[in-house]
Amino acid sequence: MTDTIVLNDISIGGGAPLVVIAGPCVIEDYDTTLQAAEFLKTVTDRLGIPFIFKASYDKANRSSVHSFRGPGPDLGLDILRRVKERLHVPVLSDVHTESQIGPAAQVLDIIQTPAFLCRQTDFITAVAATGKIINIKKGQFLAPWDITQVVEKARTAGNENILITERGAMFGYNNLVVDFRAIPIMQQQTGKPVIFDATHSVQLPGGQGTCSGGQREFVPCLARAAVAAGADGIFLEVHRNPDKALCDGPNSLPLEQVEPLLTALVAIRQAATEQAGHA
């Protein structure tokens, strides 16, 4: 059993109900961001699923210098603040430099650290020092048991409000695979809740030359497997028209597929919980 991380009226881990962290990869503008958040809130409210909205305001790790990065910290955080206040939903976004941490902590309920930066000690401890819930994305190059060292770095800042997100492991060039053993391994070795990123796990990094490709048709399959393996939450990037998304469209889930998938995940979670209770 993992720690329980409490955010307002949402409990994550420790046997609490499955949590959904979802939203567009990047903020394209206020209207589309609000529309996505409204849609997701309506669906999760109807299904009784705890919901945290996510969107990035500065994608600093795009493949190409010419790729769309987002509106930047000032406008991006203002958009997230407006969505948060209008819909009364908690918000998550990622920071990429230490200079972004302070302003982000004034708005975000959860601060996410990018997978590529999980080994950066000063960065991890600076994010953790805010006292906010921190979502550490496990690097694609990191073994599940090695995440314990990253969690320990965050703990040295006096912060135990830590989530870990599994998002696949590199498999040769331009490909990722998921080892679902990683979910219970990281839960058991760190005592922290583990979230599964079902959309970045189907990414084909750099697979289109100047940008990453993806295989969004496999998102539901991997999400179902992760919940069966005991994930405490599911992370989904969604878009009303993924083929026209300005970032990560190939691995984003169309909005119309969200409710059927979440309905299935709730059923799987219930079955897995009941089975564990009889084990």
UniProtKB/Swiss-Prot annotation:
* Keyword flag NADP: no
Which Enzyme Commission numbers does its entry carry? 2.5.1.55
Which InterPro entries has this protein been placed in?
A: Aldolase_TIM, DAHP1/KDSA, KDO8P_synthase
Any one Gene Ontology MF annotation carried by this entry is: 3-deoxy-8-phosphooctulonate synthase activity
**Compartment(s):** Cytoplasm
What GO terms describe the biological role, i.e. biological process, of this protein? keto-3-deoxy-D-manno-octulosonic acid biosynthetic process
| Protein name per the record | 2-dehydro-3-deoxyphosphooctonate aldolase
